[in-house]
Swiss-Prot record:
Keyword Acyltransferase tagged: yes
PANTHER family: ACETYL-COA ACETYLTRANSFERASE, CYTOSOLIC, ACETYL-COA C-ACYLTRANSFERASE
Main location, first listed in the record: cytoplasm
GO CC entries: cytoplasm
Gene: phaA
Species: Thiocystis violacea
Protein name: Acetyl-CoA acetyltransferase
EC number: 2.3.1.9
Chain ranges passing through the membrane: none
EC class: transferase
Length: 394
């Protein structure tokens, strides 16, 4: 790579709950807010953008290429191409990797990458409807479950894969609830202190009467959560299990994006890089324990960067489930005081196509606040994969 690849700006929406503040908006509406804001505040001429690459997992019934829709809705000219990708929970981070590759290869100068998702607006579908059903029940399928939360290989919910990890590592219910409570408490403290304010781009939501609602605060965290309150919840996937709605991530809506270019281009445009993109890795694992994906992905990413876990100043590791996140922390052996310092997806939420970019955006802003040098963003992926991205502040 002859010229350093950098991120010059990053932003995300506040994360909405399932059926919550953002539920009336399509994923493209949510993404448009972020894309438009990044163009405006960087001062980049819309026609200068080489491509827009966005992750979105739940696209059934959303129309052709949602990333393209978002691009044009944000006011970019029709000459700017766009691509929607689906790597399930890793989509938003893989989009950034694709941007990194395109810029490094000289195929693009400026790429805006990230993800968008409305789990609230995901469709129900009627399989085999073109053939018809002569007799019997004809059940619809929930695409949010089938396309987003279901293991196609073992025919089970993602929560069952978390149960598999809990059993493999002998993680108790109490330990998982304590982990989840800590995530909630860190997120609550971060929100109360305005820690996320810089990274959040407000969304204006039209109302039937009066002024639009301005949504600018994550609504999924549950203030006052303790391990004791979580301990009252029933297991969600196995009656004898340990995984509950309280020690798992949420079903959420949101969008997050970053602006990628070469350092020389940033200098030409008078933009100050937030960080350089150092290394990326994807890895595959047994789908039955898909949550362990960040272990080989992070290990390989650090190897490419020439770093050790101890070199990291901050880590954002997506919390799909407490058991899953605990397994990653245990195997990576990194300093837990540097991991998800403002809470993770158990508290903040997990809008699947956007989460990869969300953890990266949060990482970048927290690195600025702490004057941190080296950071890592990583996520597990349904179907048995992991992704990781190493960044360094210049």
């Amino acid at each position: 790579m002859s010229d350093t690849i950098v991120i010059v700006d990053a932003g995300r929406t506040a994360i909405g709950t399932f059926g919550g503040a953002l539920s009336a908006l399509q994923a493209t509406d949510i993404g448009t807010t972020v894309l438009k804001a990044l163009i405006e505040r960087t001062g980049i001429a819309p026609e200068q953008v080489s491509e827009v690459i966005l992750g979105q997992v739940l696209t059934a019934g959303c129309g052709q290429n949602p990333a393209r829709q978002t691009t044009l809705m944000a006011g970019l000219p029709h000459t700017v191409p766009a691509m929607t990708i689906n790597k399930v929970c890793g989509s938003g981070l893989k989009a950034v990797h694709l941007a990194m590759q395109a810029v490094a290869c000289g195929d693009a100068e400026i790429v805006i990458a990230g993800g968008q998702e409305s789990m609230s607006q995901s469709s129900h579908v009627l399989p085999r409807s073109r053939e018809g059903q002569r007799m019997g029940d004809w059940p619809m399928k929930d695409t949010m479950i089938v396309d987003g939360l279901w293991d196609a290989f073992n025919q089970c919910h993602m929560g069952v894969t978390a149960e598999n990890i809990a059993k493999k590592y002998a993680f108790t219910r109490e330990a998982q609830d304590a982990f989840a409570a800590a995530s909630q408490q860190k997120a609550e403290a971060a929100i109360q202190s305005g820690r996320f304010a810089d990274e959040i781009i407000p969304v204006s939501i039209p109302q039937r009467k009066g002024d639009p609602l301005v949504f600018d605060t994550d609504e999924f965290p549950r203030p006052g959560t303790t391990a004791e309150t979580l301990g009252r919840l029933r297991p969600a996937f196995d009656k004898q299990g340990t995984v509950t709605a309280g020690n798992a991530s949420g079903i959420n809506d949101g969008a997050a994006m970053v602006v990628v270019m070469k350092e020389s281009k940033a200098k030409e445009l008078g933009l100050t890089p937030m960080a350089r993109l150092v290394a990326f890795s994807s890895a595959g694992v047994d789908p039955a324990i898909m949550g362990t994906g960040p272990i080989p992905a992070s290990t390989d990413c650090l190897k490419k960067a020439g770093w050790a876990p101890a070199d990291l100043d901050l880590v954002e590791a997506n919390e799909a489930f407490a058991a899953q996140a605990m397994s990653v922390n245990q195997e990576m052996g990194w300093d837990l005081s540097k991991v998800n310092v403002n809470g993770g997806a158990i508290a903040i939420g997990h809008p699947i196509g956007a989460s990869g970019a969300r953890v990266l955006v949060t990482l970048l802003y927290e690195m600025q606040k702490r004057d941190a040098k080296k950071g890592l963003a990583t996520l597990c992926i349904g179907g048995g994969q992991g992704v990781a991205l190493a960044v360094e502040r210049l």
